Amino acid sequence: MKLVDLYNKLPNTEQNVLSVLSGGLDSSIMTMCLVAKYGKDRVVALSYDYGQKQKIELQKAAELCSKLGIGHKIIDLGILGEIAEPISANISGSEVEMPTIHDVLGDPQPKTYVPFRNLILLSLTMAQAEASNASHVFTGLQVHDEYGYWDTTQKFVDSLNEVASQNRTHKVEIMAPFSLLSKKQEIDLCIELQQTNLLIHTLTCYDPDEEGRSCGICPSCAERIQNFMKADIVDPIPYQINIPWNQ
């Protein structure tokens, strides 16, 4: 997909749009594309602190928004982390062991899954959209190349939009422009934007160290590394292990 193809799929609107920005690769590149399409004054990003292990991603989200010159709000959602801690490896303090990419291949519900996270985050963002008279909520949800969650599919987004359409006074539509793209295709869009330098302000790792370096072995890292290699560029973020980019 080229940028022009993406822009043609995005709605034309005179209202502001909201981006659900985790600080990860998908939502960050999507936010860059939204700014290029609508302008920095029309895009507002929302990030959620739900007790995720990779809390540094919120810092990365703030850095990216500063570089892009857009509004940014971090919303406290600690109760979700409290609920998910016993069963999700993705929550700080959880005793659930972090799986590797080999552990999750073919698993319909990996241990990194946070129960109903995307439903909750998107519902809150739709509420913010209605309160601020925004027309669209954009999410970087993507069907992963090697594994997937039930709440990252286009079917999931379509179902939420069907519920939201019952709102009698304010119509808000959720859009997931990357839902059918691979991460390699997303990176290609960033290359076309000539903003790969901004990817230093992203974090995909589920288990970064205290210095913010990605582990390089969790499912999210493995997929990110694989797709940067497919795109034939070096990932600018630091890793705890040596990555053979030139092989």
Mark where each language-model region is.
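Short microdomains enriched in Cys/His and/or Lys/Arg
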Residues: K230-Q247
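Short amphipathic alpha-helical surface patches that serve as generic macromolecular interface elements
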Residues: V157, E186-C190, L199-T202, C215-C218, ...
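Glycine-rich nucleotide phosphate-binding loop and flanking beta-alpha elements
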Residues: D145, F228-M229
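ATP-dependent adenylation/nucleotidyltransferase module used to activate substrates
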Residues: M1-T196
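Local cysteine-cluster metal-coordination motifs and their immediate loop/turn environment
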Residues: S123, T204-Q226
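Glycine-rich phosphate/adenylate-binding loop
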Residues: Q194-P208
